[in-house]
């Protein structure tokens, strides 16, 4: 039943409906009027209930959205915590790798020490062999001196025995001996010339073949090394530049998303204020509901965009960490290569100085030996000529002396030829080593003018052009 009407105060003007007051209406008109009022009341109640339901829905949706926001914040904190843990684990792994690198460097240092010790031992062995060879040469010189002394004694005895012969045979013997000496000299000169030409041709052929093989191999290795180094440097440079640009763009997008999120938070506050105002006016509430629905759609869209952006940011951070790790590894490798280059440069400089000293000393010794032998040979030839000119020899004794003289001359010529070849080979190896070292220094970008010494170039006999250090090592 409808609620009872309150009694109107006295003197109140009666209600007018359709131009008639309620007192003037009939019963049927009053009933119709009451029915209309009841229908209007029902409509107003239905509208009130509808707006209350809409208000409850909006409030519920706001609560759900707030809970989702809190859950997302919790998830974001968890993700940040996980990222911190991953970063800590990554730092631990980096320390482990650094320790491994230290161990590898220590092993490399030990290996270099062993190689250095082996090189010292091999150098000592070579020095011992050189000393033994020098001792053998001194023994040969002593035996040769003894033979010459014996020959002098025998010549003196022969001179005493044949001094009593006639003076007429002296002239014939001198002429015959001069003729034989000239024939022997021409014969052995032709033979020596032929042997020199054959040995020179064979040596030049071998040197040329070795030069071609080694130069081809060295050029191929240098080209492959330069190509590989250039490719890997270009590859990592492109990767670093591309990822830096991508990280910068993603950071800018993240800043923009944060601004949008702040804007959406402000809009949510405004929505709460608008919900309070819904109680005042139903029409205003309808308009605000439509506006809120639009804002909600925009919020969902921005929320999905923010989720995708965070995923992209996470992926970019992971890629950036990987690139940082690769960059650190490359920097370590680069520093290691620089250290190796400096060590090789120091060793190379030291080796050049040692080779210069050894080759200079060896050249000096060989030249001194050669000069000594030449002087000795000239003296002996002069003494022998004087003895022969002052004595009268029979043909048998003369043939014996001539045969021994030929043997002595042949051995001396062989010794002189070997010493000359050794001097020329050492000079050539020294000069080619200087050329090869200068080429290597230019290949590594080190100017030759910055060396702390002046390379000593030998002026010895040339035996061909090419990497003669390989010939010397093989010999």
Curated annotation (Swiss-Prot):
Say yes or no: keyword Coiled coil present.
Answer: yes
Location of region: Microtubule-binding: 114-257
Q: Which GO terms describe its cellular component?
A: ciliary basal body; cytoplasm; extracellular region; Golgi apparatus; microtubule; motile cilium
Molecular function in Gene Ontology = microtubule binding; small GTPase binding
For region Disordered, the annotated ranges are: 1-22
Deletion phenotype, per the entry, is:
Morpholino knockdown results in attenuated Hedgehog (Hh) transcriptional responses and impaired early muscle development. Morphants exhibit developmental abnormalities, abnormal ear development and defective cilia motility.
Q: Which Pfam families does the annotation name?
A: GAS (PF13851)
Which family does the similarity line name?
Belongs to the DRC4 family.
Q: What is this protein called?
A: Dynein regulatory complex subunit 4
Q: Which organism is it from?
A: Danio rerio
Upper classification of the source organism reads: Eukaryota, Metazoa, Chordata, Craniata, Vertebrata
What is the gene name?
gas8
């Amino acid at each position: 039943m409808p609620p009872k009407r309150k009694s109107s105060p006295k003197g109140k003007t009666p209600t007018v409906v359709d131009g008639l007051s309620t007192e003037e209406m009939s019963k049927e008109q009053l009933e119709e009027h009451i029915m209309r009022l009841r229908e209007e009341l029902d409509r107003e109640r239905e509208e009130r209930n509808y707006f209350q339901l809409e208000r409850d829905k909006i409030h519920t949706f706001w609560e759900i959205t707030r809970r989702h926001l809190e859950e997302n914040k919790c998830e974001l904190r968890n993700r940040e915590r996980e990222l911190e843990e991953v970063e800590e684990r990554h730092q631990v792994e980096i320390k482990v790798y650094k320790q491994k690198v230290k161990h590898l460097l220590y092993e490399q240092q030990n290996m270099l020490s062993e190689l250095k010790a082996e090189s010292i031992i091999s150098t000592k062995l070579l020095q011992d062999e050189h000393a033994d060879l020098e001792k053998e040469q001194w023994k040969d010189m002593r035996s040769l001196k003894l033979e010459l002394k014996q020959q002098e004694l025998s010549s003196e005895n022969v001179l005493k025995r044949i001094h009593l012969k006639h003076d007429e045979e002296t002239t014939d013997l001198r002429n015959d001996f001069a003729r034989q000496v000239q024939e022997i000299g021409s014969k052995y000169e032709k033979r020596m010339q032929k042997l020199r030409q054959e040995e020179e041709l064979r040596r030049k052929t071998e040197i040329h073949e070795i030069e071609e093989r080694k130069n081809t191999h060295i050029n191929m290795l240098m080209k492959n090394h330069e190509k590989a180094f250039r490719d890997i440097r270009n590859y990592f440079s492109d990767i670093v530049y591309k990822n830096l640009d991508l990280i910068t763009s993603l950071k800018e997008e993240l800043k923009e998303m944060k601004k949008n999120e702040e804007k959406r938070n402000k809009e949510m506050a405004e929505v709460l204020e608008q919900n309070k105002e819904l109680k005042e006016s139903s029409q205003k509430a309808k308009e605000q509901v439509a506006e809120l629905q639009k804002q909600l759609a925009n919020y969902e869209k921005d929320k999905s965009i923010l989720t995708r952006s965070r995923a992209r940011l996470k992926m970019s951070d992971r890629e950036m960490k990987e690139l940082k790790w690769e960059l650190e590894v490359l920097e370590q490798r680069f520093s290691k290569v620089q250290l190796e280059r400096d060590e090789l440069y120091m060793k190379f400089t030291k080796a050049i100085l040692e080779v210069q000293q050894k080759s200079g000393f060896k050249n000096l010794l060989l030249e001194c030996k050669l000069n000594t032998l030449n002087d000795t040979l000239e003296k002996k030839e002069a003494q022998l000529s004087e003895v022969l000119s002052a004595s009268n020899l029979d043909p048998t004794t003369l043939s014996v002396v001539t045969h021994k003289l030929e043997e002595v001359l042949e051995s001396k010529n062989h010794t002189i030829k070997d010493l000359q070849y050794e001097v020329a080979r050492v000079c050539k190896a020294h000069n080619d080593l200087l050329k090869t070292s200068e080429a290597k220094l230019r290949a590594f970008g080190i100017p030759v003018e910055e060396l702390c010494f002046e390379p000593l170039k030998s002026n010895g006999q040339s035996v061909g052009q090419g990497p003669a250090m390989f010939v010397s090592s093989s010999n």
